[in-house]
């Protein structure tokens, strides 16, 4: 897997949604709920949040040419869906727009794009099935620090 063989100079671009903290969080309220994910990644990380209601912007696309890998988080846990019933559709739209930009840009066509799907309800398999067009899909059952750290272990084999 190319992701595991990134050189030290390559940057991982981490796109994360603006969502509320998980209910069981121990993080400070002024900390992004995905900051532990960025810290756990074993390379330099460019953490770029995205707003569900705005989707991909040119600012997001501008980060792609310098990426050695792209990780896109889609979070559809119960607390997120209670906050925004369109959260899944909005995040999928963002993720697909990023994937199209990478596949359509000659300078980043070999850059791995990984989708990290956080869900915690019975609809989880349906969400995963809807994302099967992504070449790499990792699912986790919440977005606590422990779950995010375990996802990094799966991705990087650490």
Predicted regions and their residues:
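C-terminal non-catalytic regions of proteins with extracellular/luminal or membrane-system context
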Residues: 1-158
């Amino acid at each position: 897997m190319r992701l595991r063989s990134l050189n030290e100079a390559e940057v991982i671009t981490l796109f994360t949604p603006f969502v509320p903290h998980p209910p069981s969080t121990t993080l400070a309220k002024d900390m992004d709920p995905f900051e532990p994910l960025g810290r756990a990644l074993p390379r330099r990380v460019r953490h770029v949040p995205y707003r569900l209601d705005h989707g991909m912007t040119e600012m997001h696309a501008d980060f792609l040419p310098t990426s050695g890998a792209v990780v896109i988080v889609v979070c559809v846990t119960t607390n997120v869906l209670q906050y925004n019933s369109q959260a899944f559709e909005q995040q999928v739209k963002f993720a697909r727009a990023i994937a199209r930009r990478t596949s359509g840009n000659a300078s980043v066509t070999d850059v791995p794009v990984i989708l990290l799907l956080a869900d915690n309800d019975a609809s989880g398999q349906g969400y995963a099935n809807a994302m099967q067009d992504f070449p790499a899909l990792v699912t986790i059952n919440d977005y606590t620090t422990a779950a995010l750290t375990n996802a990094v272990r799966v991705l990087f084999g650490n």
